[in-house]
Amino acid sequence: LPQLLYHIQWKFRDELRPRFGVMRCREFFMKDAYSFDFNDEDALHSYNKFYLSYLRTFNRLQLSAIPMTADTGPIGGNLSHEFIIIAETGESKIYTDKRIFNVDFRNTDVDHKSLNELRNKFETFYAATDEKFNAANFDKNVSKQYKLVTKGIEVGHIFYFGDKYSKPMNA
């Protein structure tokens, strides 16, 4: 350990209406990755490396992805972040502090400390989709000049499962 396993294949969704713009059509190419780590600290380090990887990937595409704490939903786990791109065609309403776009991550090292600090920097700024939106917190933590309310598309999602899968398998 650690081990990274990748699951890449075409996926099909039997939905009445595709969700989240172009990323959730009836048929799409899913690229999943799973890390298997020795302990919780190493697993969080893997999580944070994926967090940075998403930011760097979209930056190379000249897109600003906003990391937002997300609900783990039916997939479960202890922690989750969605990466949202601002788009008029998006179905998610997003609320964020404009200063989040000023966080510089381009030269972030991949050691434990640097990655934890990076995630903490992003999490100091309010960023939520309509599912996690809290008007009182938004008003309290973001002054009017920095408020951004718009639409976005989910372009990535990471989960920290903890021992959700390894425990039942006695791994």
Regions found by a protein language model. Give the residues of each.
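TRNA-recognition modules of translation machinery and tRNA-sensing kinases, especially anticodon-binding
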Residues: 1-171
